Amino acid sequence: MSTRRELLESPYLAAVSGRKPCRVPVWFMRQAGRSLPEYRALRERYSMLAACFEPEVACEITLQPLRRYDVDAAILFSDIVVPLCAAGIDLDIVPDVGPVIGDPVRTATDIHAMKPLEPQAIQPIFQAISLLVAALGDVPLIGFAGAPFTLASYLVEGGPSRNHPRTKAMMLAEPASWHTLMDKLTDLTLGFLLGQIDAGVDAIQVFDSWAGTLSLSDYRQYVLPHSARIFATVAEHGVPMTHFGVGTADLLGAMSAAVRSGEKPGHQAVVGVDWRTSLTDAAARVEPCTALQGNLDPVVLLAGWPAVERVARTVVDDGRRAVVAGAAGHVFNLGHGVLPETDPGVLSELVSFIHSL
């Protein structure tokens, strides 16, 4: 099965599919967000969650960066905790803090009480996708979800955490409860992703933002089976799939194994790489014929244009070497999201520069 739309000229879809793109494709994680004054103006009238659940607002925010930048993909404006909220979890996204859980999930009773995700609860997200598919023309739309481990960390810790102590303690001390929680979150993530695919997204990305806190052994035992189930199921739908985490150099091989689960001919698998690992090194770590995405340090965008140009050129050159070394393709991106203080003019100039190489 092909992607939802026949976007045969898309540089992004070419690169992630192992075909030679007409130019180096580029898009940015958090390209729609606090770096844009038009986003900040709109958010004065809507909370983060309200914006996610209002189809016209989510559509407008998704489109904002495309009016400024000639990026090669749009990514749905949403948040990884949206399906948790839709499933009845008491949470809020607190400015300058992140997701805060009203009643953390820490016992077997808490896990048992979790409700499944009902499709009707996330219809506004799918309605936003329908609006975007109609508006985007030949620009592909990326849908996304949080991976079970990262969602579990928010639920168990009660909010953002540097070291995830309660999460790891449950994982190691109560493995049966842990896997029950992960199974429930895997089902939730699949419901969210498959609904997005049915609504018309052209690719998906799964963010395991906090997986880098784990050892490779723990990742393989407690996380990989659940992430693999997600990708194996999504693979049936034939859309390109990207797996991304921060600080995951030692996990890249296992993460690529997850995204290649249920592999079929023409399987379109991508692994996101942060700035701590070179793309050529990543190419040696991931499974053969996996495309790579990344990996400019977002802080470089604050360092002035000469530094941006120099480091961005290095990333593109490294990506080309990675393809020679066996990567299926390279999509230029940051190694994490656009920082709020980033000048949109620098991003615009960066897109033009990448396309010129």
Curated annotation (Swiss-Prot):
This protein's record includes keyword rRNA-binding: no
Listed pathway(s): Porphyrin-containing compound metabolism; protoporphyrin-IX biosynthesis; coproporphyrinogen-III from 5-aminolevulinate: step 4/4
Intracellular or extracellular location(s): Cytoplasm
Domain of life from the UniProt record: Bacteria
Oligomeric and partner information: Homodimer.
Keyword rRNA-binding in annotation: no
Family per record: Belongs to the uroporphyrinogen decarboxylase family.
Chain's role: Catalyzes the decarboxylation of four acetate groups of uroporphyrinogen-III to yield coproporphyrinogen-III.
GO molecular function, one term: uroporphyrinogen decarboxylase activity
Top-level EC class: lyase
Enzymatic reactions: uroporphyrinogen III + 4 H(+) = coproporphyrinogen III + 4 CO2
Main subcellular localisation: cytoplasm
Keywords: Cytoplasm, Decarboxylase, Lyase, Porphyrin biosynthesis
Protein name stated in the entry: Uroporphyrinogen decarboxylase
Native source species: Mycobacterium leprae (strain TN)
Record PANTHER family: METHYLTETRAHYDROFOLATE:HOMOCYSTEINE METHYLTRANSFERASE RELATED, UROPORPHYRINOGEN DECARBOXYLASE
Residues annotated as binding substrate: R30, Q31, A32, G33, R34, D79, Y154, S209, H336
Entry-linked InterPro entries: UROD/MetE-like_sf, Uroporphyrinogen_deCO2ase_HemE, Uroporphyrinogen_deCOase
Pfam families: URO-D
Site (Transition state stabilizer): D79
The EC number(s) this enzyme carries: 4.1.1.37
Gene behind this protein: hemE
Gene Ontology cellular component terms for the protein in this record: cytosol
Gene3D superfamilies the record matches: 3.20.20.210
